[in-house]
Amino acid sequence: IPLGLNEFLFAGTWAVPRYIGEGSLDRLLLRPLSTIFSIMAADVTLHGLGSVLFGLAVCIYSLVQLELVLSPLMVLFWICAILCGTLIQYALNMLMATLSFWVINSQSAMVLVQNISEFSKYPIAIYQKGLQLFLSFVVPYAFCSFYPSSFLLGVHTDLIYWAGPFLAAGVMLLISWAFWRFALSQYQSAGG
């Protein structure tokens, strides 16, 4: 679900290299709105809605099959965890897109990081410890699915399982925004 929401709401991150390369970022910098908001608002697509709907259907089917009844508090946690997962994916894409200020095209890095998200489709417990740490603390895709799911299913109730998605989303957003602001401070217009 977070991947679909990211594709729906934040497809604009994929346009950042183009804006920088073509010099059209200059036009956005002159607007009174946030540059990031302008980029995201320009490229909202319906592309990810299919993933969101399919993900919701799978979740509902799974809840029925497991005969799992979620309390209102757990439903609220689930919604917040989905939003946190979406923000984590956005922040990772934005970090890679921001590299376009220094390299010709950072879309290869964006694709690489998005491909790493494939690891989060499986429980991270099946991976070696190094990869578990990488997926938890370097490229924190584990907080998009594994940790929240483990908490919702009652498998794990440790602090990292319920608070981790919120912390990971907050930290990743702060890092990506700081990197973006640093890149903007170093930016020289395409004209000079």
Feature locations, PLM:
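Membrane-embedded alpha-helical segments of multi-pass transporters/permeases
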Residues: 8, 56-59, 63, 90, ...
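Transmembrane helix segments
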Residues: 93, 97-151
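Hydrophobic alpha-helical transmembrane segments of multi-pass membrane transport proteins
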Residues: 1-54
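Junction motif at the cytosolic side of a transmembrane helix
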Residues: 167-192
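Membrane-spanning helices that line or support transport/gating and their immediate boundary helices
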Residues: 12-15, 19, 91-98, 102, ...
